[in-house]
Each structure stands twice: as C-alpha cells, then as structure tokens.
Amino acid sequence: MTRVMARRTIVSVALGLVMLSVTAAHAQKTEIHFWHAMTGQLADALEAQAKEFNASQNEYEVKPLRKGSYAETLTAAIAAYRQKSPPHLVQVFEVGTQTMLLSGAVIPVHDLMQQNEIKINWNDFIKPVAGYYMKDGKLYSMPYNSSTPIFYYNKDAFKKAGLDPEKPPKTWKDVEAYSKKILAASAAKCGFSTGWPSWVMVENMHATHDQPFASKNNGFDGVDGVELLINREFGQKHIGQLAAWQKDNVFSYGGRAGTADPKFVSGDCAMYMQSSALIGGFTRSVKFDWGTGELPHWGAPYKKATSIIGGATLWVLKGRPSAEYRGVAKYLEFLAKPEQQMAWHVNTGYLAVSNTAVKNLEQGYHFVRNPKQYTAFAQLTGLPPTPPAAMQDKKAAPPKPERVATPNSQGLRLGNFVQIRDVIEGELENIFAGKKTVKQGLDEAVTKSNGLLKEFAAANKP
C-alpha cells in the first residue's frame, strides 16, 4: 500500500469514527413525545421551538406530533394513558381543564419542577392565565398558547361608510349603528360575525359583563350541584338581540369554531369577533386595511369586566419511565423563558404569559409598533386601552384602565365542557335559524348541559 493510500485509509477511518460518534450521541438522546393540535403556521412555530431546544443540548429530543383537533388530541391522550402508552406532554384546550384535573393521569407541573429542582417563578405568570389552571394553590399545567377573543374590523369598509377607521365601536349599540351605516353604503354584505360562538358570545359575554355562566363560582368550587345560568336575563337579552340582528344582516352567523373566518377575510362582514391568535394569520391573508378593538359592551347596569382565556396549556402525563421526566421539566423550563414567550407571541399572536415577557415587550415599544397585539393584553388583564409607552412623550394624562377583574371573569371550570359547548352551539343554531325562541333554546341548552354536569359529578365522586 502506498503512503498516499495509507493516509487516505487513516482519514476515512477517522471520519467514520467521527460519524459513528455523532450518530451514537444522537441515538443516546432521550425522546420526549409531545402531542398537540396545532396546524399551519402555528404548527411550524411549535416545531421550530422544539428544534431550537433539541439543538441547545445533547440529552433530550422533543418529538412533536399532531393528533388532530383539540378534542381529538384530548381523547387520544386519555386513551393512550389508559392503554399505558401515553405521550410525556399533551396540549389540552381550556375546556378540558376539569377533565384533566380529575383524571388521575397528570403530574402537576409545580410538582414536576420541584422534583427536578428547577426553579420557576410561578407568581410571574399573568393572573388570568395562571388562575385558570391552578388548584389548591398549585399550577397543574404549563401555560402555553393562551388567547382571548377580540374585535376585528375592516378599516376600508369604515371609510366607505363614513366612519372613523381609527375608532372601533365600544358598545353593542355602536356595533348596530355602524353595521347599518356599512350596509347602507354597500361597504360590506353584513355588519359582523363571530367565530367560536359559545366561547365568544356566551362564555366571554357573561364574563365581560360580570355575569355568572354557571353556579358554584363558575365551577371552581366543586363539581357537585353545578348548573348553567345562561338562560337568565342577560343571556336572553344578548342572544335575543343577535337573533334579531340576524334577520337584517347586521349579524350573520357563520358556523362553529373558525368556519366564519372567510366572512371577514373576504370582506363580506366588516366586523368580526375571534381569537387574538388569528392576528398572525390575518396579517398574511387579509388584503384590506384592518384593525382591532376590545369586545363590545352593553353598558349600564353591567360592570365592564375583563375577558377570559382560550387556547391551551401543556399537561404532563403519568406512565413514562421516571428518568425521562427530567427532560420534560427541562423543556418546560425552556418554554417558560421570557425570550421564548416573547418570540412565541410575536410569531403567532398568542399571548406572552409572564409579566416579565409582557414588560419587556412594552419597554421595547413592541406594542406601540404593533397596537393590534396589545388589544388582547388590555382586555384580558385590565390594562389601559392604549400602551403606556405610547403616552410617554405626550402631555395628556395617561389613560385609565376600563375593565376590572371579577370572580365571574376568572374563568370556567366545568366537567364535560367539550360536550356542553356543543350543546350550547347547537341551540344557538336553532335560535338563529328561527326553529326555537331564545328562551326555548337557552332553556334546552341549560337542561341538557346540567345533565352532562351531573354525569361528570357522578363519575368523579371522591
């Protein structure tokens, strides 16, 4: 063998050893399985976070996997736990909270971090988010993609109708008046629509008007004897008005979940109520000039309260080898970092869920440059409607908060909530189609939902 060939052989062997070393190191990484329900650009952002974590260390490999819709992901996770093959982490939407709390399948994130000696400042999470997922003073799931419904409006349609494009309506009477002007000017085919009808028009309308959605402190005081209260005076007033507006296109019902989104994106409806998480998607898909505002209010005698959250948190499931849970804890620690929350907010439109992240965004003039993304924070937390940083160079007095947090706006904790939401939306559809009166529809929704609540209580007796 010539010297040249010998050298080539040595180099080849050395390179082979390096490749084997890299492969072995990669193979030694402990996999952390993470089931989620994200799609499109949101799924891309979730995958990017996991890749960044994976590249930051050599011990763990987070493996995200979409399992379907929120409801399908929840069902799949519970089934996998019962079959003793659960993922380490699962993303569960807010209506699954009571189910998860009483499932016996979860490790509270507070306990997980304590067991792994990882310090998290639990008090730094913003109260409306943390409060939704706490039990007995402990945070049970890690806040992740939290949102709240806000008001979107077409500025071009406002201009065509002679309305001020920088002043969205603040009251429901304003919404009606603006809609009629828009229709009269042929600026749009309908005044407004909504996504997620139960979440926006029933759950959040009760919260923002300081009205109870259910008894027993909206379910926070236990599962026994909880009943829905949405067929009372306020529920009948609000849903009744929507049904009346439906007749003359002031309001146009567009279906459940996000099926009404095209009504706004196409310009058919000039105003729209949907999750704050759609800001990123609308920025890419909407071709006209648009803005955001807070949810409309009916005014006196109702108090103007903060809104409640939607979105989801990350739950840690039991049933995996104990040594693997340190990797779960490390990933949750990574996601809790202010810089990760800030990037997640900017890239997706979901809320940054810690006070530190929100403060950093404010001090960096992010909300001044991106006022659309400030709306949700103001409405959810009771912050002034104008970013404080925007007023620093002005002589005018700083704006005062317009909303207050109340027990009725802290959230909802109900068993079988996924099914209850379906019941409510089915009856809303009957009302909007004229098949039932408002009272008949809401009474039926309450009766059916109370049956589901009783079933849940019976199945979860201590």
Regions from the PLM with identified roles:
Residues 37, 204, 211, 236-333, ...:
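Extracytoplasmic/periplasmic substrate-binding proteins
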Residues 48, 52-125, 160-170, 263, ...:
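Extracytoplasmic "Venus flytrap"/periplasmic binding protein-like
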Residues 110-125, 168, 211-237, 284-285, ...:
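Short, solvent-exposed loop/beta-turn-alpha elements that line the ligand-binding surface or hinge
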Residues 94-150, 176, 203-207, 234, ...:
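Hinge/lid segment of periplasmic solute-binding proteins
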Residues 79, 88, 118-157, 190, ...:
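A structural signal for short loop-to-beta-strand junctions that line the ligand-binding cleft
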Residues 135-144, 149, 174-227, 269:
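Extracytoplasmic/periplasmic solute-binding protein
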Residues 278-288, 299-423, 460-462:
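C-terminal lobe and pocket-closing loops
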Residues 176-180, 220-254:
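Glycine-centered hinge/linker elements that transmit conformational signals in sensory
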